[in-house]
């Protein structure tokens, strides 16, 4: 374990009877958990000790998208046997049909066995405020592992540790193929550098010539005015004295004109810039989507006013619940609002996370992944493993 380099702190709260993923599936880093501690505030009045369980997907289990080579070979052989059977007698066909039925039953039994072995569940630790409040552990979870935690009991268990760099993690430079890089000889590189230098020099020369021409034109205009007045003077001393006066007056006039030109533009541009920044900030706060714990996504449509909802707050909500295909499965848009207390286990986990931080009058869209909604449960109008979208409005807060 000494070879693993800590990168950042890891922390996760596992509330009772809520399947909580150990890490997000798109987090390409190893996690090392070293401490489990209990929250002394109970979720219910039973005050039962909390047991932390780890649920791990079996790595050898075949995903739905993977191909079982043995089954594929059996299917191909079955097709060949069917073709040969066209030439066989009727009695042979009946025997083959019976064999195929038996094979199908065996395959169904194998699939049932595989489903039972898909997940492994183990007990990690049991904690209680009266006997043991915390326990040092040492669990390392690789990025490719599908791991969830589940607490049974009356108390939340907090897990802490570190995101670590594992010696077997793939370095970033290995993600890029050597075939993508072009090989150049020293002569080709020198030639390209010389060509780039020539292009840069030509562009710079062109820019300098344009700037010099503008500068010279401005000087020439000023010199013409001075020359006209100097032509009227005959003595050298008068010319020198008058020249200094003309130059000073001309410079003063230019500075004054520049100040007059810059002042209105500065005030106007500053005012316009402030208005744009204010509008941009408001729009950003209003429409920017945020990804919270467990992949719950919130997007504020309207910012409310007053105190914000927090843990233990009693909130009254209006809402419309939709499936991913847009079908409405539940709503509360009139009559008595829907009341509940935040983070007391009265609603699905995604609602506790998504409603926290809202103020009265606020409107928000909450997108909840299946594990933080109803998971594998099938409810009226809600299929198993459904992602749910709620458009909610906070109408009361206590």
From Swiss-Prot:
Function: PPIase that acts as a histone chaperone. Histone proline isomerase that increases the rate of cis-trans isomerization at prolines on the histone H3 N-terminal tail. Proline isomerization influences H3 methylation thereby regulating gene expression.
Keyword DNA-binding: no
Oligomer and partners: Binds to histones H3 and H4.
Family: Belongs to the FKBP-type PPIase family. FKBP3/4 subfamily.
PANTHER family reported in the protein's UniProt record: 39 KDA FK506-BINDING NUCLEAR PROTEIN, FKBP-TYPE PEPTIDYL-PROLYL CIS-TRANS ISOMERASE FKPA
Enzymatic class: isomerase
Gene3D superfamilies: 3.10.50.40, Nucleoplasmin core domain
MF annotations from Gene Ontology: peptidyl-prolyl cis-trans isomerase activity
Span of domain PPIase FKBP-type: 312-398
Reaction catalyzed: [protein]-peptidylproline (omega=180) = [protein]-peptidylproline (omega=0)
Classification via Pfam families: FKBP_C, NPL
Protein name: FK506-binding protein 4
Keywords for the protein's UniProt record, in alphabetical order: Chaperone, Isomerase, Nucleus, Rotamase
Gene Ontology CC terms: chromatin; nucleolus
Intracellular or extracellular location(s): Nucleus
Activity regulation annotation text: Inhibited by both FK506 and rapamycin.
UniProt gene name: FPR4
Taxonomic superkingdom: Eukaryota
Bias (Acidic residues) ranges: 170-228
EC number(s) given by UniProt: 5.2.1.8
Compositionally biased intervals (Basic and acidic residues): 264-287
Chief location bin: nucleus
């Amino acid at each position: 374990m000494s070879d693993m380099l800590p990168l950042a702190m890891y922390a996760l709260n596992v509330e009772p009877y809520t399947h909580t993923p150990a890490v997000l599936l798109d987090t390409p880093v190893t996690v090392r958990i070293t401490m489990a501690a209990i929250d002394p505030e109970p979720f219910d009045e039973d005050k039962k000790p909390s047991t932390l369980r780890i649920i791990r997907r079996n790595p050898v289990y075949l995903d739905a998208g993977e191909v079982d080579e043995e089954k594929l070979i059996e299917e191909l052989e079955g097709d060949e046997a069917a073709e040969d059977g066209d030439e066989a007698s009727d009695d042979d066909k009946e025997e083959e049909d019976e064999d195929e039925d038996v094979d199908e039953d065996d395959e169904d039994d194998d699939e049932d066995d595989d489903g039972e072995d898909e997940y492994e569940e183990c007990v990690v630790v049991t904690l209680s405020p009266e006997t043991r409040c915390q326990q040092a552990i040492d669990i390392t979870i690789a990025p490719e592992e599908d791991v969830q935690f589940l607490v049974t009991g009356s108390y939340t268990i907090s897990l802490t540790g570190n995101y670590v760099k594992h010696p077997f993690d793939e370095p970033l430079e290995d993600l890029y193929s050597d075939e993508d890089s072009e090989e150049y000889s020293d002569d080709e590189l020198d030639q390209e550098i010389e060509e780039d230098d020539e292009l840069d020099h030509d562009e710079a020369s062109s820019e300098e010539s344009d700037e010099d021409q503008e500068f010279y034109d401005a000087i020439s205009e000023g010199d013409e005015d001075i020359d006209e007045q100097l032509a009227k003077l005959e003595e050298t001393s008068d010319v020198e004295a008058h020249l200094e006066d003309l130059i000073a007056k001309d410079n003063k006039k230019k500075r004054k004109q520049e100040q007059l030109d810059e002042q209105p533009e500065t005030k106007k541009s500053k005012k316009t810039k402030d208005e744009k920044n204010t509008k941009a900030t408001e729009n950003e706060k209003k429409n920017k989507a945020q990804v919270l714990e467990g992949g719950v996504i919130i997007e504020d449509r309207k910012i409310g006013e007053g105190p914000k909802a927090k843990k233990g707050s009693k909130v009254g909500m209006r809402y419309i619940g939709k499936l991913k295909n847009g079908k409405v499965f539940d709503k509360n848009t009139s009559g008595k609002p829907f009341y509940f207390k935040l983070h007391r286990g009265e609603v699905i986990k995604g609602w506790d996370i998504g409603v926290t931080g809202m103020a009265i009058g606020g409107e928000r869209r909450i997108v909840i992944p299946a594990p933080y909604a109803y998971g594998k449960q099938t409810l009226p109008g809600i299929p198993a493993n459904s992602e749910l979208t709620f458009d909610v409005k906070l109408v009361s807060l206590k």
